[in-house]
Amino acid sequence: MSNTAGQVIRCRAAVAWEAGKPLVIEEVEVAPPQANEVRIKILFTSLCHTDVYFWEAKGQNPLFPRIYGHEAGGIVESVGEGVTDLKAGDHVLPVFTGECKDCAHCKSEESNMCDLLRINTDRGVMLSDGKSRFSIKGKPIYHFVGTSTFSEYTVVHVGCLAKINPSAPLDKVCLLSCGISTGLGATLNVAKPKKGSTVAVFGLGAVGLAAAEGARLSGASRIIGVDLHSDRFEEAKKFGVTEFVNPKAHEKPVQEVIAELTNRGVDRSIECTGSTEAMISAFECVHDGWGVAVLVGVPHKDAVFKTHPVNFLNERTLKGTFFGNYKTRTDIPSVVEKYMNKELELEKFITHKVPFSEINKAFEYMLKGEGLRCIIRMEE
């Protein structure tokens, strides 16, 4: 165990005091881990659109002050009672959803939606005692999705930590703890395109490009990128995208455009925008008889869409996925190995790097739509 085990650690954290206001670097106190918890030192973290969405708090229950962040890589500092599969010094990726290994979902090979540790954006405290491990002068600071990686130290449930190869560079593989794995797994684990097949990807942000990367790894012969922003098309070529369709450039529905391009439809489609209009297009653009559409993007909670039942009766399949169907502890270490084996390229997702003291720049980049992922280096 480390020499700080069992003690309160004082460190820097980027605290969101209110919705939409710049984060403030504060000295926080991080309590020791309790039963089934692990305290980790964060070395690198990244900003995901989910952090920005809840920081803006335009459509959700606002919970402040809060420490955001959930794409990161770090090293175990100490473990709480009952933790046997991690020890101080282990390299880990904290993940917003977990794997308890005991519930029906964890025991099923088909599901990764753990009953105990499934994502909960409203909970700002730890499961074991309903309390926060962060405080400033005695005032609790709320957690975010069980990870809160915008802090030099954080406390995470053991089931939400993937133990990874210590040789893997944390400034690269930290991206695998959320968006990249979500898109990659949607293709590899759910859509499962065969070699030589045609794939359409709706939305060419980081998640969509990761889905395209999955299609590239699968040996797809054609990967059609669909996006309303034509300036994304050139960048997408690096991820295997071979053709581009901007729905605004056509009078007819984009699913009809794709059907004409592909002799009645693509074999697989992956929808990564959360737009219900795009969801309909993604489903209706797959080929009858064998086409599979996979929904990844998260819509507004009240959103609904409709399509004709004949689309199903003609043997098109519509699926949804959560975190690319990856189990946090069981599967993510092998995704890291894909990077280590040079199958998966992560460098091309990284468009910006900033020190922790300039974390608000990462928010500016994302709000302006500049780049894909910004790596935040915790040590100055």
UniProtKB/Swiss-Prot annotation:
The record's free-text note on cofactor binding: Binds 2 Zn(2+) ions per subunit.
Location in the cell: Cytoplasm
Cofactor(s) recorded in Swiss-Prot or TrEMBL: Zn(2+)
Presence of the UniProt keyword Disulfide bond in the record: no
Residues reported to bind NAD(+): 50, 203-208, 227, 232, 273, 296-298, 323, 373
Catalysis performed (reactions): a primary alcohol + NAD(+) = an aldehyde + NADH + H(+); a secondary alcohol + NAD(+) = a ketone + NADH + H(+)
Residues annotated as binding Zn(2+) 1: 48, 50, 70, 178
One example of a Gene Ontology biological process annotation: formaldehyde catabolic process
Residue numbers binding Zn(2+) 2: 100, 103, 106, 114
GO MF assignments: alcohol dehydrogenase (NAD+) activity; S-(hydroxymethyl)glutathione dehydrogenase [NAD(P)+] activity; zinc ion binding
EC code: 1.1.1.1
Protein name, UniProt field: Alcohol dehydrogenase
Listed Pfam families: ADH_N, ADH_zinc_N
Enzyme class at the top of the EC tree: oxidoreductase
Organism: Malus domestica (Apple)
Subunit structure, as described in the record: Homodimer.
Entry annotated with the keyword Chloroplast: no
GO cellular component, one term: cytosol
Entry keywords, A to Z: Cytoplasm, Metal-binding, NAD, Oxidoreductase, Zinc
Family statement drawn from the similarity comment of this UniProt entry: Belongs to the zinc-containing alcohol dehydrogenase family.
Binding site for an alcohol: 50, 70
Entries under InterPro entries matching the protein: ADH-like_C, ADH-like_N, ADH_Zn_CS, GroES-like_sf, NAD(P)-bd_dom_sf
SS bond partners: none
